[in-house]
Amino acid sequence: MIKAVQSPPTPYLQFSRKQWAALRNSVPLTLTEAEIVNLKGINEDLSLEEVAEIYLPLSRLLNFYISSNLRRQAVLEQFLGTDGQRIPYIIGIAGSVAVGKSTTARVLQALLSRWPEHRTVELVTTDGFLHPNSVLKQRDLMKKKGFPESYDIRSLVNFVSKVKSGTPRVTAPVYSHLIYDVVPDEQKVISQPDILILEGLNVLQSGSDYNHDPHHVFVSDFVDFSIYVDAPETLLQSWYINRFLKFRQGAFSDPDSYFHHYSQLSEQEAVAIASQLWSEINGRNLQQNILPTRERASLILGKSANHAVERVRLRK
């Protein structure tokens, strides 16, 4: 039996990396080194050790929660005398820009789909529900992209509601980081998966975050289990700048890239612009709209240098 680190009363159980890793409990690692390379983000050093010590215990925990949810559904069907319909289990992943949400989402998708039950696991990012650039420009919101007011929150809530209601076929808009915009006439089809992983800055936000567009139902109302990927802001800013520099040498060099003009910058100029973008946009959004949602999460992954998770907090 693994005991959590003793601390003052808190809604969370707290684990060191070593304690959390021990909860893997012989779950086999089904990903190869080559597959892990394909899953990691541009700015991360995702290792087999990280997957084994952090994500395998998490996938085991999620498997328990999902199995419990299925048993609850079976009890309800028995009570009602119905066969019922497949209701997807929704996992939400939130956190700052550059913290590694996408990598966490992709690793969990790969691991959860390989459990013996062979569950169907879909992944959708909330980026697709940003208003198109044409709308953001019209509303003078291009410099607030990722802030609550930049999302078509009603469409996002409608999408998640349909998925959670068991609608056989639901579509989600697709976002391209190359063109920095929603892709016109392109959609991702979601057809009653066993699990939907929803990843985005705004997954845990609620009414107080949308004063500009008051409504009564939010994405978080439909999420069964939520994860917040956390790190000190000094690290987040550093990771953001490093990622910007890598994009400058890679994706930004594509003539079709929205940020192609940044590819001509010197390293010093690129660092200055990335620092400015962080302080004016991403850092502000973190402090005002993202970090305040952290304590709403079911589980918090606390990262240190090199994107390594060093502590885990699990809601009691």
Swiss-Prot record:
It is found in: Cytoplasm. Coiled coil: none annotated. Keywords: ATP-binding, Coenzyme A biosynthesis, Cytoplasm, Kinase, Nucleotide-binding, Transferase. It holds the Pfam family PRK. One of its GO terms (biological process) is coenzyme A biosynthetic process. It catalyses: (R)-pantothenate + ATP = (R)-4'-phosphopantothenate + ADP + H(+). Its EC number is 2.7.1.33. GO terms for molecular function: ATP binding; pantothenate kinase activity. Belongs to the prokaryotic pantothenate kinase family. This is Pantothenate kinase. It comes from Sodalis glossinidius (strain morsitans).
